[in-house]
């Protein structure tokens, strides 16, 4: 095999592997808080402020991410800060076409774990 062809194949393989590790994921947060409470979420990813969202009871909001997604969340007097997407931690755990589905409840944040086919508590609210 000539050198140019070998190099071209190597470059193509490297780029395809790099592209697959930078896949986009969707982080979805669903509000399942008691008393029809609103959930306020302010997120940042890769140094970008993604703004503040108010998620009403039994509704959700999604972000498309490939890097760490860190969010401040609050409802009533309860506040917390959570990494709701970390590619090293979550890439293999998320389901449904690269979607990390979070359900926010009174006791904390639950993630649907694809391998276990169920929601599992990942983060408790501070003070719980």
What are these model-predicted stretches?
Residues 2-63, 72-128:
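Intrinsically disordered, low-complexity segments enriched in small/polar residues
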């Amino acid at each position: 095999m000539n050198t140019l062809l070998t190099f071209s194949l190597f470059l193509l393989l490297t780029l395809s592997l790099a592209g697959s590790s930078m896949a986009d994921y969707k982080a979805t947060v669903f509000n399942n808080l008691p008393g029809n409470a609103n959930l306020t979420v302010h997120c940042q990813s890769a140094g970008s402020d993604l703004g503040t969202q108010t998620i009403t009871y039994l509704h959700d909001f999604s972000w498309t991410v490939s890097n760490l997604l860190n969010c401040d969340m609050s409802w009533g007097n309860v506040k917390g800060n959570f990494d709701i997407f970390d590619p090293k931690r979550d890439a293999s755990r998320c389901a449904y076409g690269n979607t990390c589905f979070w359900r926010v409840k009174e006791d904390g944040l639950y993630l649907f774990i694809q391998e276990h086919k169920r929601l599992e508590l990942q983060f408790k609210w501070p003070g719980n």
